A protein has these predicted regions:
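Intrinsically disordered, Ser/Thr-rich regulatory regions of eukaryotic membrane-trafficking proteins
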Residues: 1-602
């Protein structure tokens, strides 16, 4: 029997909004349900689990979690059950994400974190969309399948980073020129001026061109688009891509370039131009200022609701002021709106907000419980209007459909221009660069992974694990190195060395200022009262968070963060590993073909 795993999302009424689980989980749950008398014996071997059965079995633990949160402000992060089964919890916009598995705790927590990120990309703050629109829940399932598959097979995805294929300058210029011409031709044909064209090969970043007015494409959004492209091509209905006219189009909400995600509406078109070679077009649609302020309003309203439930009134005034500011930004963004449906929805929103505002102000002035109860009731209607406004201003099926034909033509332009180098870049992606030429300078070194956590770009020699013999470095050992190091990083350890019978392993994370001068933190990364989030990029930038913790008086934008993982054969002294690490970091631009510079990725 396989390992059991499942993901469930519950709303505030403990109803199931979404479920994704494997057959082992279904079999186990149905057997329990028959024992409990909530499922007839003849349904014991069904291939699905009814929602009412899940609610019956999980309501006690979900309710307990909500009580721990609301009454004590001290929710569970995980529960270990008899037999090794683990249940992990996470929360987003009042929805409870529950992950169940028999594997390592960090892996289940990471899966929950990725699930929240994917839900935000697909639905923004309105998680209920997963129940209301089956297309969304199906796409979420496909994305999670792709992530799980890539996590097990792609080192960069495991690290939530981007691997860039290194091309010589002349080749790079001709690729960018081809992408530029495709974007320029698109701008003249469709009603959109903010466009990115990204070329990806075997889930690796090859090149990007962005139109002048487009917002910078963040590493988070690039990584998401790679997983989306992988999911699209794997799940194509014909199973055998005809690259002459295949296109996959999606409406998503990207994070944007700022440190906290903003849910910016984009149409994404993925066009395969050869096997494992995709052009991804990003069309920025709608009003980004409105989308950002709408998302902020959802976030601050959710915080207000949490404060009310937890009765933590000492922080209510600043939370209310944040909500008021976010609503003002929404109103300002809609001043020039000419759409009748949006205008009608906005008027309703303003009316409800004015009533809410009076009640919150009344409560803050004289702590009147009745005023707070009334504000809470009004907030429910206000939330529904917010959802409607979000849908009206971010969904634009028209541009998604009308731009498809032009995008296919633009992709053909690129495909023709790059025809002579397609095979070369595919081979280059498989063997980006080899460690062989550096073995003399770094005796004993068999593998390293260097990650610039400003651009989230990873530099690492290519290894064909299929060719390796079991006694040499295996994929399992490299994956364990990464998981082990990140588990300790979450606990606050930024330097680590350990060994097994064959290899010595090392992990270091450090900070530099913009001049490359090392920075030493005087603030400990963790304390007994605070746990760090799961290391990663897609849900929230963990590395941004630790910059803020370690250097509270410095702007995070002035701090650069790096990590390096090293594997040496045999026993190696600590000074040798440290010296190799320093020299590797200093010469990494030679390996990657360009200096480490935050703007290089773009």
């Amino acid at each position: 029997m396989g390992t059991m795993n499942g993901l469930m999302i519950f709303d505030h009424l403990n109803d199931i909004v979404y479920i994704k689980c494997n057959n082992t989980f279904i079999k186990h749950i149905n057997e329990l349900a028959v024992e409990d008398g909530v499922l007839p014996e003849e349904n014991k071997h069904d291939t699905s689990v009814p929602d009412n059965v899940l609610v019956h079995l999980f309501s006690p633990v979900v309710t307990s979690q909500r009580i721990m949160t609301s009454q004590f402000g001290n929710s569970y992060s995980s529960i270990q059950c008899y037999g090794g089964l683990k249940i992990c919890f996470d929360e987003f916009m009042g929805y409870l994400f529950v992950g169940i598995g028999e594997g390592e705790l960090l892996k289940i927590q990471k899966y929950l974190s990725i699930s929240i990120a994917m839900v935000r990309f697909l639905c923004g703050p309105d998680v209920y969309e997963l129940k209301a629109r089956s297309q969304r829940s199906e796409l979420l399932s496909n994305l999670l399948d792709s992530y799980n598959d890539l996590r097990e097979n792609d080192q960069a995805v495991l690290l939530e980073a981007i691997e860039q294929v290194v091309l010589n300058p002349n080749l790079n210029t001709s690729v960018i020129q081809a992408l530029k011409e495709s974007v320029v031709s698109l701008i003249t044909q469709i009603d959109c001026f903010k466009i990115h064209a990204l070329l990806a090969v075997k889930n690796k970043f090859l090149s990007l061109y962005s139109s002048e007015l487009a917002k910078e494409l963040s590493p988070t959004d690039i990584l998401f688009s790679m997983i989306l492209a992988d999911s699209a091509t794997k799940n194509s209905s014909d199973g055998n891509l005809n690259t002459s006219n295949s296109i996959f189009s999606y409406q998503v909400l990207l994070s944007g370039p700022e440190s906290s995600p903003k849910c910016l509406p984009h149409a994404i078109h993925i066009v395969p131009i050869d096997e494992e070679l995709n052009i991804i077009f990003f069309l920025e649609i709608g009003n980004s200022a409105l989308s950002s302020s709408l998302y902020e309003t959802f976030c601050h309203l959710h915080i207000m609701q949490q404060i009310t439930v937890q009765r933590d009134f000492s922080v209510m005034r600043p939370a209310y002021e944040n909500l008021e500011l976010a609503v003002k930004k929404v109103n300002d963004s809609l001043k020039k709106n000419k759409n009748a449906a949006i205008d009608a929805c906005h008027k309703n929103l303003v009316k409800k907000w004015d009533s809410m505002k009076k009640k919150y102000t009344e409560f803050l002035k004289n702590s009147a419980e009745e005023a707070l109860l009334r504000a809470e009731t009004l907030a429910l209607g206000f939330l529904e209007d917010l959802k409607q406004l979000l849908h009206l201003t971010t969904v634009n099926e028209g541009i998604l459909k009308s731009s498809r034909k032009n995008v296919i033509e633009a992709a053909k332009l690129v495909s023709e221009k790059l025809n002579s180098i397609k095979d070369f870049v595919k081979v280059k992606a498989m063997k980006n660069f080899s460690l062989a030429s550096y073995l003399e300078d770094f005796p004993g070194l068999v593998h390293f992974i260097y990650v610039d956590r400003t651009t989230h770009r990873v530099t690492s020699p290519s290894i064909n694990f299929q060719m390796e013999k079991p006694h040499l470095l295996t994929k399992r050992k490299v994956w364990h190195l990464i998981d082990f190091a990140l588990q300790h990083l979450q606990e606050g350890t930024m330097s680590l060395m350990w060994k097994d019978t064959i290899f010595s392993y090392a992990y270091f994370l450090w900070f530099e200022d913009s001049n490359g001068t090392p920075l030493k933190s005087t603030v400990p990364l963790t304390n007994p009262n605070k746990t760090l989030p799961v290391p990663g990029l897609l849900n929230n930038d963990f590395y941004q968070k630790i910059k803020e913790i370690c250097f509270p008086k410095m702007s995070p934008s002035k701090i650069r963060c790096y990590e390096i993982f090293c594997v040496h054969l045999g026993l190696v002294s600590q000074p040798c590993v440290l010296e190799h690490t320093r020299r590797l970091a200093a010469t990494i631009w030679e390996l990657s073909g360009h200096p480490s510079h935050p703007m290089d990725l773009i």
